């Protein structure tokens, strides 16, 4: 409780002092009589940007109640403050965070974004950053898939993801990351992303464990949690009794829980709980049956999967 209160106090102090490191002209006005900001405009600007009333008032006064210019200036100052804060916090460990999952038809994306504390991971501004990373990766996937109908799987590491542009304001994700760091006062990292695209007669199963509720309607298409899985599969035969989307969710649940390293072969002998080939593993939801046997009874074939665990050890060649 003491730690939680300290974190809340720290975040409150940061929000009150936003832009405090900016040049004097940002928070200091000339001795001439200031133009009184229209109350409705002030409330509107505050609601739209989330910045303090003090800074919204200064922006409106600076631009003579021009809402558009005031908003643009506030964002510019916030990005400068964010980069300054990011530079100061660089090197602090980011072991917490979220896995974000976005699924749209025959495309699906997993991203991992890290922060210092679980408290910040539950903040909507952090979740919006995860969403921006997922959407930017999805748009990148769309551009790569424009002229192909084949199955594709691809991975993006930190530096590649940060260069992607967001649809929000066409800024690079690196800028959005710096802005979030400035707003929330913790070091953060956009670590990695994976995406899969499948032909029209294939399926993508999705599952997130430790899922957080979407507290904002704008996040309704996202899934957030500490573990996430994508599984690619197809039906070998028509069976109206099989709920294929639900089957995909169960396979994703198995992948998260049993941590397979490869799909394996239907010819692999049944293994125990230490087995790493998915088809030979005991099925998580029915330990008396292997995954391979379950799929055979369902008339389904698994082709590939991706599993992410937030904060897991970096793979060879990966930088965090």
Regions found by a protein language model. Name each.
Residues 2-11, 15-320:
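N-terminal assembly/interaction segments in proteins that build large macromolecular machines
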